[in-house]
Amino acid sequence: MKPINVGLLGIGTVGGGTYTVLTRNQEEIARRAGRPIAITRVADRNLELARQVTGGKIDVTDDAFAIVSDPAIDIVVELIGGYTVARELVLKAIENGKHVVTANKALIACMAMKFLPLRRKKASSSLLKLPLLVVSPLFKAVREGLAANRIEWIAGIINGTTNFILSEMREKGLAFADVLKEAQRLGYAEADPTFDVEGIDAAHKLMILAAMLWLFVHSLCRGITKLDAVDITKRTDKGVELRVHPTLIPEKRLICQCEWRNECCAGQGRCCWPTLYYGAGAGAEPTASAVADLVDGTDRGISCPHLAFQPDRLVDLPILPIGEISSAYYLRLRAVDKPGVLADVTRILGDRQISIDAMIQKEPQEGEDQADIIILTHVTVEKNMDDAIAAIEALPAISGKVTRLRMEELSR
């Protein structure tokens, strides 16, 4: 059979790993696919790096558009990142009837609807693939194994970089900046780590997951930059609830065992028991492996609707405003140690129908007149908590900002 020619756009950390994985496992992939699959052209602005990674064995160019327009290329792997050039390259590749594999979550989350109608029109055997590292098994389960099931909620740790940083900080007592530098040295974090540490990458993944679970696509990028890293999504009567933020969960939940650069995702459906998917998330090889797997699957004609539903069935579901979500809360505040402060705080909470589950006041350090107060609340509405925190912070006896963490049982 005719070999499958792959054009690789971008040969940085992930691109270099993808080239290595596909080259190293070439014989195994060929046995499974029934014919050879090989990267035959690479595009990168750094030609010297491209030649170094490929060993000068294949054609390299700094013109990515030449590859997406090359009739000899069957599959385009886009690993450049970003919204602008990557978008034009993907659109051009689709127009030219090529299969596209991309690890660019931001591009898919924000521009899926630009691609789906064109991709369907071209009637190719596979559309855009969404290699989201450890959560891709969940995608397969939803799209292929749970097609008759209604998923109620999913929750997880879906950014390996932030999980690594938090694990290192806890275990070694290191500062955030020091651990971030180590993550960058190990290749777990990008030179500009904003997308990871601000929760934006996790939000992109969560938006795509929500689209796959609930026919929801038009609003994929709404509110991305305003999302506050456990990630939670569920469907309610009022709309889809999407949240990306640090969360306290019971120690007995399996998600609590997810450490270092690993990621995990748990979900529950009406007809199935809770399931959990776990694996390495940060680093070149896990990402490259996911990309290589999708290249192999694309050639073998493994085709399902890419957002789990037929394109003409997708709808625009509302995202529940963050003020309308319900959660229990952990609050930590620093207050002057004097009579009446606790009474003021509890009055503020009570006036807003916020019930206290437990409260601890720590003793002040020697020579200090301020103490930490920790409050656990029962489930309440977010907007009520916002109002309460603003009122508490306005009290003269309160120093600084109130620390707030949401708490989830993950059993609803």
Curated annotation (Swiss-Prot):
Recorded catalytic activity of this chain's protein: L-homoserine + NADP(+) = L-aspartate 4-semialdehyde + NADPH + H(+); L-homoserine + NAD(+) = L-aspartate 4-semialdehyde + NADH + H(+)
Gene Ontology BP terms: isoleucine biosynthetic process; methionine biosynthetic process; threonine biosynthetic process
InterPro entries found in the cross-reference section: ACT-like_dom_sf (IPR045865), ACT_dom (IPR002912), Asp/hSer_DH_NAD-bd (IPR005106), HDH (IPR016204), HDH_cat (IPR001342), HDH_CS (IPR019811), NAD(P)-bd_dom_sf (IPR036291)
Enzyme Commission number(s) from the entry: 1.1.1.3
Pathway(s): Amino-acid biosynthesis; L-methionine biosynthesis via de novo pathway; L-homoserine from L-aspartate: step 3/3; Amino-acid biosynthesis; L-threonine biosynthesis; L-threonine from L-aspartate: step 3/5
GO molecular function: homoserine dehydrogenase activity; NADP binding
Chain residues that bind NADP(+): 9-16, 105
SUPFAM superfamilies according to UniProt: ACT-like (SSF55021), Glyceraldehyde-3-phosphate dehydrogenase-like, C-terminal domain (SSF55347), NAD(P)-binding Rossmann-fold domains (SSF51735)
Record has GTP-binding as a keyword: no
CDD domains: ACT_HSDH-Hom
Binding-site positions, substrate: 190
Disulfide pairings: none
Keywords: Amino-acid biosynthesis, Branched-chain amino acid biosynthesis, Isoleucine biosynthesis, Methionine biosynthesis, NADP, Oxidoreductase, Threonine biosynthesis
Enzyme class name: oxidoreductase
Superkingdom to which the source organism belongs: Bacteria
ACT domain sequence ranges: 330-407
Residues annotated as catalytic: 205 (proton donor)
PANTHER family: HOMOSERINE DEHYDROGENASE (PTHR43331:SF1)
Family indicated by similarity: Belongs to the homoserine dehydrogenase family.
Name of the molecule in the record: Homoserine dehydrogenase
Native organism: Methylobacillus glycogenes
Lineage: Bacteria, Pseudomonadati, Pseudomonadota, Betaproteobacteria, Nitrosomonadales
